[in-house]
Amino acid sequence: MATKKEEVKFEDNLAELENIVRKLESGDVALEDAIAEFQKGMKISETLKKTLNEAEQTLVQIVGKDDNESEFSAEQKEY
């Protein structure tokens, strides 16, 4: 399960990525700076994607456990 520190880090990274996108969309960034910001944004994007994939896997495991427990409980009630 994610700790509070990990959640804040995810939110901070997401906010930073949104800030980069706004800068690039504004068009007020020099080419060299735009390239650097784009590269930074891509790295942040990969980090966010990894975090989301890990969270998804955790949820799949939890749901899988809950399904097994539910089936077990239903079987007990039939007896």
Swiss-Prot record:
It catalyses: Exonucleolytic cleavage in either 5'- to 3'- or 3'- to 5'-direction to yield nucleoside 5'-phosphates. The keyword Cytoplasm applies. InterPro entries: Exonuc_VII_S, Exonuc_VII_ssu_sf. It is an enzyme of class 3 (hydrolase). Disulfide bonds: none annotated. GO terms for biological process: DNA catabolic process. Its EC number is 3.1.11.6. Belongs to the XseB family. HAMAP family: Exonuc_7_S (MF_00337). Heterooligomer composed of large and small subunits. NCBIfam families: PRK00977.1-2, xseB. This is Exodeoxyribonuclease 7 small subunit.
